[in-house]
Amino acid sequence: MKKLLPILIGLSLSGFSSLSQAENLMQVYQQARLSNPELRKSAADRDAAFEKINEARSPLLPQLGLGADYTYSNGYRDANGINSNATSASLQLTQSIFDMSKWRALTLQEKAAGIQDVTYQTDQQTLILNTATAYFNVLNAIDVLSYTQAQKEAIYRQLDQTTQRFNVGLVAITDVQNARAQYDTVLANEVTARNNLDNAVEQLRQITGNYYPELAALNVENFKTDKPQPVNALLKEAEKRNLSLLQARLSQDLAREQIRQAQDGHLPTLDLTASTGISDTSYSGSKTRGAAGTQYDDSNMGQNKVGLSFSLPIYQGGMVNSQVKQAQYNFVGASEQLESAHRSVVQTVRSSFNNINASISSINAYKQAVVSAQSSLDAMEAGYSVGTRTIVDVLDATTTLYNAKQELANARYNYLINQLNIKSALGTLNEQDLLALNNALSKPVSTNPENVAPQTPEQNAIADGYAPDSPAPVVQQTSARTTTSNGHNPFRN
């Protein structure tokens, strides 16, 4: 036990260390693939459908049965004194020679199993897409919260500086009020961003069953975009490989086969039967033997039988014709479903194609928007310092900058998700696509809102020190200096 204790401690520590490491996209997906209940249910349904093929095949194979019987008879009244013991055993063999309905049932089950297999493949692709979407939603929520925190710090600095300028009489109180209003707005946005991050983490947990303290973040420096193939080429590939379209085609084939199965109700059946049996009967009692000799003889018999059983349905009240019509109507419905699936695939491919191109354009546009917004903010701050711009201009420029950064991050994640969407529409989405995205990830980031954007109660309390409804402060000739370093209230005057 003393030797095992260090090993157990080491295993426990290694388990904690593995949990503390950042998980990447592939690791998260592997955990989802192993633990996702919906995918596991789909796999069980597929296995059950294929196992049912053996059940459908069994009526076509020989049916062998063994029977045994024992009967004891005790006579009374006129049969008083006559008792008997009867024992019998038989072996029966039945082989279907011609029964088209049984062959058709086997074919139907094979097609149904094929549909279930396609359903499982669809669920696999859905899990890949949902896992990646939830993963990138978490990263996007982290970015939004980070930018909101940075915007809050920037607005706070502007609020601090504006208050100090107001204290020395350089600006009007409306500038302070505008800065405070903007700061309160950012605080509200921060609450929303924190909540969105918590919800995104919970959505990922719902898929994988695990919480992740850290996730590998997107490598923005090496982020690249690729234009998709021409839409006509994508549509041709989707025609061949889209799983929804394939499932609709298989369902149409199944409905066609069900028409043939209903028509087989008019066909005859022919079965071969063979049996062998023995029986033994013995008598006892006072009346089983008379004066003239034995009246009830014991018997021991055996018998072999071979025969053919033929059946031809002539009229069944119109049931077969009704079943044929029902199957024909079901085939029409399956055909319409195939057309609907085809239109849906075309729409999905074209929409995904357009979304990818739009994401690429948005990324390029927001990159330039960030650069322009930063230049505008620098110009506004310089103009405000010399009195040619107002604090409203500075606040608007700050908001524009951080909104552009958030939109740029959102466009990047939308591009990645749209890449997976179009592969899913083509029916080619697999783990290799996740591996390619996984290579675009880099350093870990925390998923805890407190680590992404620590709460600033002291800063908020300082900001709350100024009440817009309070009387205007007395102007004092004091030097403008930053007071946040020592924790004093810059709005106390």
Swiss-Prot record:
Ranges that cross the membrane: 63-74, 83-96, 269-279, 301-311
Topology of the protein relative to the lipid bilayer: Multi-pass membrane protein
Positions annotated as Sequence repeat: 23-230, 231-446
Spans annotated as Disordered: 270-298, 446-493
Subcellular location: Cell outer membrane
GO terms under biological process: bile acid and bile salt transport; enterobactin transport; monoatomic ion transmembrane transport; response to antibiotic; response to toxic substance; response to xenobiotic stimulus; xenobiotic detoxification by transmembrane export across the cell outer membrane; xenobiotic detoxification by transmembrane export across the plasma membrane
GO cellular component, one term: cell outer membrane
Molecular function terms, GO-annotated: bile acid transmembrane transporter activity; efflux transmembrane transporter activity; enterobactin transmembrane transporter activity; identical protein binding; monoatomic ion channel activity; porin activity
Superkingdom, natural source: Bacteria
Side of membrane Periplasmic, spans: 23-62, 97-268, 312-493
Signal sequence annotation: 1-22
Description of the deletion phenotype: Cannot grow on efflux substrates novobiocin or fusidic acid.
Family: Belongs to the outer membrane factor (OMF) (TC 1.B.17) family.
NCBIfam families given in the database record: PRK09465.1, type_I_sec_TolC
Oligomer and partners: Homotrimer. Part of tripartite efflux systems, which are composed of an inner membrane transporter, a periplasmic membrane fusion protein, and an outer membrane component, TolC. The complexes form a large protein conduit and can translocate molecules across both the inner and outer membranes. TolC interacts with the membrane fusion proteins AcrA, EmrA and MacA.
Biological role: Outer membrane channel, which is required for the function of several efflux systems such as AcrAB-TolC, AcrEF-TolC, EmrAB-TolC and MacAB-TolC. These systems are involved in export of antibiotics and other toxic compounds from the cell. TolC is also involved in import of colicin E1 into the cells.
Identification of the protein by name: Outer membrane protein TolC
Native species: Escherichia coli (strain K12)
